[in-house]
C-alpha cells in the first residue's frame, strides 16, 4: 500500500522523520499532542446525544447503525466513504482517520498514528517472514495481542486510531518480490494459520465477545498481488492472469482463513487486475466471495488510490463517476484516498448508483466503529480505558520481541559443530559486514519508532570482546573495503559476517532483478573467510531468499544463519543463537532458489504448476522440482531429533451412498461435500526425542504427497506443531487429520476434491502410506 500520492515507504519514512525533526526544532525538543482519545456520543458534553438510538449501548449494533445511517445526508454518507472520514458535528460524530498500520508493531506509516513525547515509540517485532519461520502458531497470536494492547494505549492518549490495515497475507511465490518480507511465506497453510492467529491476537477482547473488537485488523492485499515494480511492470497496471485452480488452491486460502477462522473486520482489495478485472471493482471477488461465500463481518477497503488507479492507470471506466459506482456496486465500502469522496455524489446524480448502495457501504463502516466502542462514549470508562504510556514498550513486550527473533532465526549450515561459540573461550571476535551494525535495517518496512535498537555488533559486544569493520559502506557494496576486514578476521578467534539486504534492495515498489548478494558482498565474504583464523559464521539479513551457493559449498564458511529482518532486539537475538543461549529452531518459510531460476522465470508468470511443454518449472516447494539452494522447511538445531510413528491408519474408507456414481465407475477423486465427508478424520501419533543435551524446540511437520490427479502438488503441508524438549527428553505429538479438508486438493475448475488412492505421509525422514478408498 502506498499513500494517496503513491509514495514508497522509503519516502514515507523520510517525510515522517522530517516532520518530526521540524516539530522538535519548533517546540524546543518536545512534540505536543492531544492526550485524550477522539470519540462519538460524548453525552457529558452534549446530553441531547443520549436521545439518539445510535448512542444507546443497550441496542444491538445493527439497530444503532441503522438509526445512524437514516439520520445522515447523502453528503455526510459520502464523506464517510474515505479514510479521512468527515465529522458530522450536528450528531456529535468527530472526524475519524481509518488508516493506521500494525504489520509487526504499531507503525507511524499512515496518518492515523503518530508518536510524541507522551509515547515516543512502540515495540517493533521482527518482520512477519521471520515470525512465520518460528512455525509457532501461539506466538503469532501472542504478538498480535501485544500489538493491540499498545495500539489501544496509544489510542487512549490521542495518538492512534482503532483500525489497522494489517496483516499482509499474500503468498510469497517469487523471491524477487520486494514485499515478501511482509508476508508469512510461500505455503498456503502456514499463511492461513498466521493470518487467523495474528488477527485473533489483534481483535479478540478479553471477554471473548466476537461482536466486540479490541482493534480492527485488515487482511491484505486481495488477491493474487505479488508484483510491485519489476523491469518496468508496475502493480498499478499489472494484470495477474491466474487459473481458477491456482486461485483457489494457492492465492485465496489465507484470505478465506482470515475471514472464516480469524473473523477479521476488514479485507483490502489490491491494485492489480485479476484476469482483466480490477480487484476493487470485481463483484465476483468482493460480493461473491468475501461477503457471499465467506460471510465477512466488516468492511472492504481499497488499497490507497486503487479506485483512482483503475480509472486513470487501467482505464477500466470512461468516467470517474463510473469508477466510483462500479467499485461500490462490486462491494467496496471504504476508499483509501479521496476518490469516492469526490465522485460518488455525482455518480448518484447521474443515476449510476442508488443511495441504497451508499447506505450499505457506510453501514459496514459504522458497524465496525460500533464494535470498537467508538460510539460508546468516553474510552476511559470502557474496557482497555486504563491502558496508557505505561503499557507501551514494557520490559515484557521488549523481551517478547527478542524471543520472537530467536524463535525465527534459521541455522542453515553448521560444519563440525562450529556453533555455538563458547563465550568463555572467545577472547576476540571479528564482526564484519554492511549489516553488522545495522539498526533501521533490522526493522524492515511498515515500521514504527522502536523502543530501542540492539544491533548485531552491540549484541555480540555484550558477550565477548569484538573488533568491527564494515567491509562495505552500505548494502549495495559497490566498493568493498577489504583490508581492515581481512586484518581483524586473520587474528580473531572467530568471525561473524553480517550481510544481506535492506529497503534499498527489496521494498514496496522495488522488486529485485537478481537474488545474489548485492554488489561486492560475495567477494567480501569469500576473501574474509579465506584468511580467517577461526570459524566463520555468515548471517544473512533479508526478507527474500538469496543464492548463497558459494557459501554453502565453501568449507571455510562453517555456519550460515538466516536472520530475516529481526526487529528492534535482533542483535541480541543473533548473539543469543551464536553463543548457544538459545538453540535455533526456525525453519525456512520459503524456497531459496538459485539465480538460474530467476534468470529464466519471468516474475509476471502467476502459474504455480510446472509446464513441461514450455519448460516452465513451477513455483514453491509444492510444485517446483528443480535444484534449490535451501528448501522450504530447512533449518537445523544444536540438537538432533528422532521421530517415531506410534499410531496411524493405513486405510481410510469413505462412506458413500449406495446410489453414488463413484460406486459404479472408477472415480479418481470425490467432491468434498456431502455426508461422506462429515466426521471423516483420523489421528496420527508420533514420538519425538531430543537426542542432544541442550533444550530445544522442534517443529514437527506433517506433509502429504497425494495421488497424481488434477495436477496435484508433489507435496503439501497438512499440519505443524512446535514442541519444547529438554535435553534427552521426548514427547508425544498428535495430529488430527480431516480427510476431506486436510487431504483435499483443488481440481482444474476450482472444485475441492479428495483424491482416492495412496497418499504418502511424511514426518521428518519417516514415510507412511495411507490409502483413501471407497
Swiss-Prot record:
UniProt organism field: Medicago sativa subsp. varia
Q: Which GO terms describe its cellular component?
A: apoplast
Q: Give the UniProt subcellular location, in the record's own words.
A: Secreted, Extracellular space, Extracellular matrix
Question: What is this protein identified as?
Answer: Beta-xylosidase/alpha-L-arabinofuranosidase 2
- Name of the top EC class for this enzyme: hydrolase
Reaction(s) the record says it catalyses: Hydrolysis of (1->4)-beta-D-xylans, to remove successive D-xylose residues from the non-reducing termini; Hydrolysis of terminal non-reducing alpha-L-arabinofuranoside residues in alpha-L-arabinosides
**Molecular function terms in GO for this entry?**
alpha-L-arabinofuranosidase activity; xylan 1,4-beta-xylosidase activity
E.C. designation(s): 3.2.1.37, 3.2.1.55
GO biological process annotation, one example: arabinan catabolic process
Looking up SUPFAM superfamilies in the UniProt record yields: (Trans)glycosidases, Beta-D-glucan exohydrolase, C-terminal domain
**Zinc among the record's keywords?**
no
Question: What is the role of this chain?
Answer: A bifunctional beta-xylosidase/alpha-L-arabinosidase, exo-enzyme that acts synergistically with endohydrolases. Releases xylose and arabinose from cell walls.
Glycosylation site residues? 136, 437
Q: Which keywords does the record carry?
A: Carbohydrate metabolism, Extracellular matrix, Glycoprotein, Glycosidase, Hydrolase, Multifunctional enzyme, Polysaccharide degradation, Secreted, Signal, Xylan degradation
Q: Where is the active site?
A: 303
Q: Which family does it belong to?
A: Belongs to the glycoside hydrolase 3 family.
Secretion signal: which residues? 1-33
InterPro entries linked to this entry: BXL, Fn3-like, Glyco_hydro_3_C, Glyco_hydro_3_C_sf, Glyco_hydro_3_N, Glyco_hydro_3_N_sf, Glycoside_hydrolase_SF, Ig-like_fold
